Amino acid sequence: MEGRTLEEVQEEVFKRHGVLVPKKELEDLAKALEEAGLLLTEKVEARLKEEEEKLKRERPMRLAGLSYPEGEREARAFLEAFRASYPGEGEEARVLLMPHLEPSRVPEVYGAALAALEKTPPPERIYLVGVAHRPLKEKAAALPVPFQTPFGPALPDLPALQALDALLPFELFNTPLAFREEHSLELPLFFLKGRFPEARVLPLLVARRSPELGEALKVVLRDFPGLLVLAVDLSHVGPRFGDTPLTRTLAEEARRRDLGFLERLAEGEPEAALAFLGANPTRIDGVEVVASLLPLLRERKGKVLAHRLDLEAPTLSAVGAGTLVL
């Protein structure tokens, strides 16, 4: 409403469309928007401020009971079942690319990530880099608080986070509300915490490519070594994303793009992986993360363990997911 009163909105609608909307309808609309948090009023601002203050203390589980079990015993059984869904063996990872897609859609891809984690010695810390699905004030952000999981809180590595923040030309600890419902950290962290219960975590989100982040992480990793995890998904195709309903041709193109991207990363050639995508017509959402972490991916060779393009039947759309170890 841009600071205008309901009467002014009523007048503007009448001028533009010749329709006099009853004030009661406008009041009901404003109330509904306020309750949904879509209209910034004093009440909504106060609620957001309260949420932000809570997030500065801890990040609660948002998807427990929906995407994974809330209880530890059930969560352990969940991990075992997902590992069983992948029949192969893993390889030790210094860098791991894994999904953040709803686990039930790609169980064998998460299972491949668990197989890799089985072969990886427990790290002191995990650099978990996800994709921001909400706007950030800066190119990237971190939330230096415990993240709750069924296996107990994943504690932040504050010294490493502070060292990273000191090297960046922007404030790293920005936009805490962007972490409130961010599944690109919560879902991978469930699997990582289950496998490495003692590891500290650096929870990072990337909104736009940030070469500065990659360079700073390269420096910080020398003093604070750990496992680097890219929590990214691959192609997004179909009506949900602006395409026609999924066809064999579209699915083949999405798979070709996904595997070409992953295989070039596995050859230690991240620039070639990005160049292969061109304008990214199948909307691989890991592009900004990979572009930000180039210094950490160059000349690191590895192996693609799993890939799947998963159909979302109600919308005839599909999303790709993969697991890659470097």
UniProtKB/Swiss-Prot annotation:
NCBIfam families given in the database record: AmmeMemoSam_B
InterPro entries: MEMO1_fam (IPR002737)
Family: Belongs to the MEMO1 family.
This protein's name: MEMO1 family protein TTHA0924
Highest classification ranks of the organism: Bacteria, Thermotogati, Deinococcota, Deinococci, Thermales
Organism (species): Thermus thermophilus (strain ATCC 27634 / DSM 579 / HB8)
